[in-house]
Amino acid sequence: RELAEAFHLPDTDNLNEEKLNDSIIWKFSDYTELTNENRKLLQEETGWSDEIVNAIKTSEEADVYKSAGLKDVNGNLERTDIDWGAKIPQDRIDRMRSLFGDEVADKWSDKTNLDLIREGKAPYGPDGERVNLHHIGQKPDSPLAELTNTEHKTNDGILHDKTKVSEIERPVFRKEREVYWQNRYNELTNQ
């Protein structure tokens, strides 16, 4: 019943408790849990570390990261398709201008993705949206995966266990993201 209320299902008082639980479990059991054998094969295929592979819960989740072409670097899954010299998309600058005025928009108009990460801000990905950091396995100390906004949104149900409350503390994660992107800047500029 708590899950039904969490998902705002209508008229749960008149539903049979067993049928309600079965329907909710069915909704979230469409995914294939990774077996030890699957984990071994995934690691051989991708070269990802034990920490990353062990944090992945389902084969569908693994497919999201593989399809994104993510590479294991320093225990996180990084994108290889970010154009670091690309400027902030013009539609974003135009939006800044309409919301905050010329002074703010002009300040940001010449900034590149590399400039953004130096300041601890997410770069723009190939979909023209900010890159999202995702905790693989949804634990606060999980490895991070760089996903486009599109990948993160369209795979929401695969990446996030909707049957439980998130363990990620948003204020802590906000600071973690800032430090992550600054470290990524240092990694890129010290090569």
Label every PLM stretch briefly.
Residues 1-131, 137-191:
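Nuclease and nuclease-like effector domains acting on nucleic acids or nucleotide cofactors
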